[in-house]
Swiss-Prot record:
Binding site for (6S)-5,6,7,8-tetrahydrofolate: 121, 125-127, 355-357
Organism expressing this protein natively: Cronobacter sakazakii (strain ATCC BAA-894) (Enterobacter sakazakii)
Biological classification of the source: Bacteria, Pseudomonadati, Pseudomonadota, Gammaproteobacteria, Enterobacterales
Pathway the protein acts in: One-carbon metabolism; tetrahydrofolate interconversion; Amino-acid biosynthesis; glycine biosynthesis; glycine from L-serine: step 1/1
Keywords assigned: Amino-acid biosynthesis, Cytoplasm, One-carbon metabolism, Pyridoxal phosphate, Transferase
Chain positions of site Plays an important role in substrate specificity: 228
InterPro entries: PyrdxlP-dep_Trfase, PyrdxlP-dep_Trfase_major, PyrdxlP-dep_Trfase_small, Ser_HO-MeTrfase, Ser_HO-MeTrfase-like, Ser_HO-MeTrfase_PLP_BS, SHMT-like_dom
Enzyme Commission number, as recorded: 2.1.2.1
Name of the molecule in the record: Serine hydroxymethyltransferase
GO biological process: glycine biosynthetic process from serine; tetrahydrofolate interconversion
One example GO MF annotation: glycine hydroxymethyltransferase activity
Subcellular location: Cytoplasm
Transmembrane segments: none
Subunit structure: Homodimer.
Stated family: Belongs to the SHMT family.
Length: 417
C-alpha cells in the first residue's frame, strides 16, 4: 500500500535540494526568456494527479485498454475547450510537445523529400521549420524565406520562392519575430500554388486566445501550438484545424498515435484542460493585453538609451536587441545580465556575423514578468537596469547594484504568493 504522506524531502534529499533551489531561483530571478512562463497551481495539481497512472492508447471512446471511462472525460474536455478557445472544429491534445505536434503535421501531409517553404532560423524561424540539424531539415527539401531590410516578413520574396520551387507546404510561425504575421496573405500564396499552409503559433497562442494577436486558425489548413509559453499551461503540444475534411483529421490523429507516440500523458492532458479553461477567463485577456503593453514599454526604453531593436519595435510579446553596434556579443550580454539575476537568451540577429553559439543579440520577452504582476512602470525600470549593465558590461559594481534592485522587486512581486 502506498501512503499519501510519502514525500521526496524525506526520501531523496539530494533531489529535493535541487528542486528547492530551482524554486528559489524562479522567485529571485527576473525571467525574460520569451518562451518561458509560470503556470498556475491548478495546472500543477493536475500534473501531479493519479491520472499519471493510466495508460490510454487511442482516443476518447476508441481506446485499446479498459478502464478509460474517466480519462475519456478529461481528454474530451481538453479537446472541446481547445476548439472553443481558438475557433477550431478539430483538436488533438495528445502531442507531448510542440515539436511532436509539428512532426505529426509533417507526417500527415508530406512524404520524405517533399519541398517545404519555412522561415529561416537565422531570421526568426524555429528548428522544426527546416533547420538542417532537425528532422525537418533532414527529411524534407527546405526552402527558406526571410525578412526584408525593415525586419518584416518579405511576402514578395515568399511568393517568388513559392512560385519557383512549388513547395507542398508553407510554414508560418516563428521563435524570434516581433511583428504581426499576415496569415491571410500566406494562405493566398499557398493557394496560388496548391500548397498546404501550416502555422506554428506556439509563441503567440496566449495572445491569440485573448484576441490580442490575429488568429491563424481560420486561414491555415493546420495549426499547432505549445500549451506553455504565452498560453501559460503545462509543457505540451496541440494540433488544431478548421474547415478541413474528415480524411485530413484522421490523418492527423494517426500521425500522432500510433505513428509518433504511444500512450498519451493523461495527467498533462488534464493540465491542458485546466489551462484552456483559465485562458477563457476575463483576467486572462487582461493579462495578455498587459504582456503586449509591457513589451512595447521595454522597447521604448532601449531605443531611448541608444540600443537597436530589430524591426524597430514589437507587436507581440518579444523583441530582439541587436548589439552589433555596441560591439557586444549575445553571449556576453546573457552572462552579464545573468549575474544580476536577469535571465535572457542570446539570439542571432539578421545578418549576424557571429556563430549561433555566440550571436550578436539577445531575445527578450514579457510573459513571465507580466505574470508576476509587473506593469509598464516596473518593466521600464527593469529595462533601464539592463541598459546600465550593457553600458558597463565589465563593471561588477554596477551588476551587483542591479542585482540588489532585482532581489528587492522580486520580493515585492512574488511568482507564487
Amino acid at each position: 500500500m502506498l501512503k499519501r504522506e510519502m514525500n521526496i524531502a524525506d526520501y531523496d534529499a539530494e533531489l529535493w535540494q535541487a528542486m528547492e533551489q530551482e524554486k528559489v531561483r524562479q522567485e529571485e530571478h527576473i525571467e525574460l526568456i520569451a518562451s518561458e512562463n509560470y503556470t498556475s497551481p491548478r495546472v500543477m495539481q493536475a500534473q501531479g494527479s493519479q491520472l499519471t497512472n493510466k495508460y490510454a492508447e487511442g482516443y476518447p471512446g476508441k481506446r485499446y485498454y479498459g478502464g478509460c471511462e474517466y480519462v475519456d472525460i478529461v481528454e474530451q474536455l481538453a479537446i472541446d475547450r481547445a476548439k472553443e478557445l481558438f475557433g477550431a472544429d478539430y483538436a488533438n491534445v495528445q502531442p507531448h510537445s510542440g515539436s511532436q505536434a509539428n512532426f505529426a503535421v509533417y507526417t500527415a501531409l508530406l512524404q520524405p523529400g517533399d519541398t517545404v517553404l519555412g522561415m529561416n532560423l537565422a531570421q526568426g524561424g524555429h528548428l522544426t521549420h527546416g533547420s538542417p540539424v532537425n528532422f525537418s531539415g533532414k527529411l524534407y527539401n527546405i526552402i527558406p524565406y526571410g525578412i526584408d531590410e525593415s525586419g518584416k516578413i518579405d511576402y514578395e520574396d515568399m511568393a517568388k520562392q513559392a512560385k519557383e520551387h512549388k513547395p507542398k507546404m508553407i510554414i508560418g510561425g516563428f521563435s524570434a519575430y516581433s511583428g504581426i504575421v499576415d496569415w491571410a496573405k500566406m494562405r493566398e500564396i499557398a493557394d496560388s500554388i496548391g500548397a498546404y499552409l501550416f502555422v506554428d503559433m506556439a509563441h503567440v497562442a496566449g495572445l491569440i486566445a485573448a484576441g490580442v494577436y490575429p488568429n491563424p486558425v481560420p486561414h491555415a489548413h493546420v495549426v499547432t501550438t505549445t500549451t506553455h509559453k504565452t498560453l501559460a499551461g503545462p509543457r505540451g503540444g496541440l494540433i488544431l484545424a478548421k474547415g478541413g475534411s474528415e480524411e485530413l483529421y484522421k490523418k492527423l490523429n494517426s500521425a500522432v498515435f500510433p505513428s509518433a507516440q504511444g500512450g498519451p500523458l493523461m495527467h498533462v492532458i488534464a493540465a491542458k484542460a485546466v489551462a484552456l479553461k483559465e485562458a477563457m477567463e476575463p483576467e486572462f485577456k487582461t493579462y495578455q493585453q498587459q504582456v503586449a503593453k509591457n513589451a512595447k514599454a521595454m522597447v521604448e526604453v532601449f531605443l531611448n538609451r541608444g540600443y537597436k531593436v530589430v524591426s524597430g519595435g514589437t507587436e507581440n510579446h518579444l523583441f530582439l536587441l541587436d548589439l552589433v553596434d555596441k560591439n557586444l556579443t549575445g553571449k556576453e550580454a546573457d552572462a552579464a545580465l545573468g549575474r544580476a539575476n536577469i535571465t535572457v537568451n542570446k539570439n542571432s540577429v539578421p545578418n549576424d556575423p557571429k556563430s549561433p553559439f555566440v550571436t550578436s543579440g539577445i531575445r527578450i520577452g514579457s510573459p513571465a514578468v507580466t505574470r508576476r504582476g509587473f506593469k509598464e512602470a516596473e518593466v521600464k525600470e527593469l529595462a533601464g537596469w539592463m541598459c546600465d549593465i550593457l553600458d558597463n558590461i565589465n563593471d561588477e559594481a554596477v551588476i551587483e547594484r542591479v542585482k540588489g534592485k532585482v532581489l528587492d522587486i522580486c520580493a515585492r512581486f512574488p511568482v507564487y504568493a
